[in-house]
């Protein structure tokens, strides 16, 4: 089994907004490595390999799966919603899943910071650079789990082992 590392799927413009110091190198000429879009329908091959189908969500629904110890949970990602935050416990750990619709990006974090459990929410009036807030301090947080405004400015949340994928995956 491969070891997963924290990651976020986003677009380049959003990444640069959050990390203006970034540099990218284009190593692909489009010939040797073709760019492929994510599938919008299930192939016959995928359907054959699925086994029994879990019908709680549509097969192509986006989810963010979280795994802590022996516990796992999938959080549905609604592409019609600009920003959302799931606050839950998985495997006895307080977690939050941040969703940012314009870039179809989700990430999961531990909500515990210095023995304090934070309660996050998607703030409709916060800027896109920091669309989430915690109720306890009113601090603003980025999609990458960094506090950029408020009493916790400069602090970072700890990433959780997870994956953004389609429900059937």
What would you call each of these model-derived segments?
Residues 1-169:
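Mid-to-C-terminal functional-domain signal that highlights helix-capping/loop sites
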């Amino acid at each position: 089994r491969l070891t997963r590392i924290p990651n976020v799927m986003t677009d380049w413009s959003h990444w640069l907004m959050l990390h203006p110091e970034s540099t990218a190198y284009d190593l692909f000429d489009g010939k040797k490595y073709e760019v492929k879009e994510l599938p919008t329908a299930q192939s016959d091959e995928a359907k054959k390999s699925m086994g029994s189908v879990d019908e709680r969500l549509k097969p192509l629904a986006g989810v963010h799966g979280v795994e802590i110890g022996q516990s796992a949970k999938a959080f549905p990602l609604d592409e019609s919603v600009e920003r959302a935050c799931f606050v839950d416990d998985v495997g006895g750990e307080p977690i939050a899943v941040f969703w940012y619709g314009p870039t179809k990006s989700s990430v999961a974090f531990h909500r515990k910071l210095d023995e304090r459990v934070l309660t996050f929410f998607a703030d409709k009036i916060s800027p896109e650079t920091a669309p989430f807030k915690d109720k306890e301090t009113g601090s603003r947080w980025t999609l990458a789990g960094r506090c950029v405004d408020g009493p916790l400015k400069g602090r970072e949340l700890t990433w959780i082992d997870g994956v953004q994928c389609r429900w059937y995956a």
